[in-house]
């Protein structure tokens, strides 16, 4: 795969701010109409909910040292230890999830990512994983910085809140989205920092971070990231490193 740069080449800028007066509103209405029509099509969904684990497993070298931040019940780390022979370490704040990790035989530390990773030396791990955790953190930028301090590479995945179904709910229905993959209302969701693909690329470009590779979930199927995926991607996974 051709290595994309971290300078917005993955998502093109459309220059809407420079349109003639009234043209922006016209184009915005056209986009909403198109998105409404597409939103009527059922999403295939991802039956397993584990598409990211397949890609993460491929991206991690055999025998690598791996730190999984917000490791949940330890499912991913258990798989990586078994299939990729990694030296794994999980970090999780939820006591019940920590017990699940212990039951699986997965090494785990109970800790709050918001407190930082001061206990971990620089470049102590080959890969640091942040799977479906970033949007739930109080200080996501600080955790991203820590991820790239303690790891040679990072793998980050998150729901794309610029997906067209989300935009339709917000613009056309004035409602926060509730989907099969995100079945929680705004007052019970753990997602406190809503992130988009473009926002992640902006952070990378401004922080000296290179996007090594990228993948998306579109209509229930995973594939490599394309330049026009900012509205199509339901979920995003990127591999990053310091430029």
Regions found by a protein language model. Give the residues of each.
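N-terminal, positively charged/glycine-rich alpha-helical extensions of SAM-dependent methyltransferases
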Residues: 2-37
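Class I SAM-dependent methyltransferase Rossmann-like catalytic core
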Residues: 31-49
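Conserved alpha-helix/loop element of class I SAM-dependent methyltransferases that forms part
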Residues: 47-63
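Class I SAM-dependent methyltransferase "Motif I" SAM/SAH-binding loop
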Residues: 70-72
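Class I SAM-dependent methyltransferase SAM/SAH-binding core
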Residues: 75, 79-116
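Short conserved loop adjoining the S-adenosyl-L-methionine
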Residues: 116-122
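A short SAM/SAH-binding and catalytic strip from SAM-dependent methyltransferases
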Residues: 127-138
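S-adenosyl-L-methionine-dependent methyltransferase catalytic module, highlighting the catalytic core
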Residues: 141-146, 153-243
